[in-house]
C-alpha cells in the first residue's frame, strides 16, 4: 500500500498532475479511466525529504534511479518502475498510458 506522499511523488514524476488539467490527457473508455503520462523522472538532492521517500520506493522495487552530472555536481534522478506503475494503477484505479 502506497502512502499519500509516495502517490504524490510518483504522479508528479509521471506528469500526471499536469495531465488532469490538460484536455485530451485523461479520458474514459469502456468504463475505465485512462490518463496519459508525458514523462517519467524526478530530480532531487541527497538529504532532501523527497530523496528518502524515493529511496524507500526503490527498495520496494517501485522505482529506479541514476545519477546525472551537471557542471561538476551530481544529482540523483528517479523514475517509476513498471511495477510502480502497476501498483499506482491498482491503488488509484486508473490506467496510465505513456506519451513520448
Task: Say what each PLM segment does.
Residues 1-52:
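Short amphipathic alpha-helical interface segments
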Residues 10, 63, 78-80:
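Hydrophobic beta-strand residues in large extracellular and virion-surface proteins
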Residues 16, 20, 60, 91-94:
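Surface-exposed polar/charged interaction patches
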Residues 72-100:
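Short, amphipathic alpha-helical interaction segments positioned at domain boundaries
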Residues 43-60, 64-66, 75:
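Short amphipathic alpha-helical interaction segments
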Amino acid at each position: 500500500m502506497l502512502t499519500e506522499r509516495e502517490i504524490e511523488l510518483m504522479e508528479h514524476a509521471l506528469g500526471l498532475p499536469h495531465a488532469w488539467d490538460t484536455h485530451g490527457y485523461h479520458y474514459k473508455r469502456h468504463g475505465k479511466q485512462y490518463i496519459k503520462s508525458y514523462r517519467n523522472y524526478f530530480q532531487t538532492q541527497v538529504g532532501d525529504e523527497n530523496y528518502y521517500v524515493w529511496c524507500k520506493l526503490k527498495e520496494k522495487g517501485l522505482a529506479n534511479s541514476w545519477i546525472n552530472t551537471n557542471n561538476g555536481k551530481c544529482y540523483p534522478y528517479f523514475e517509476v518502475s513498471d511495477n510502480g506503475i502497476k501498483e499506482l494503477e491498482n491503488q488509484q484505479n486508473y490506467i496510465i498510458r505513456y506519451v513520448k
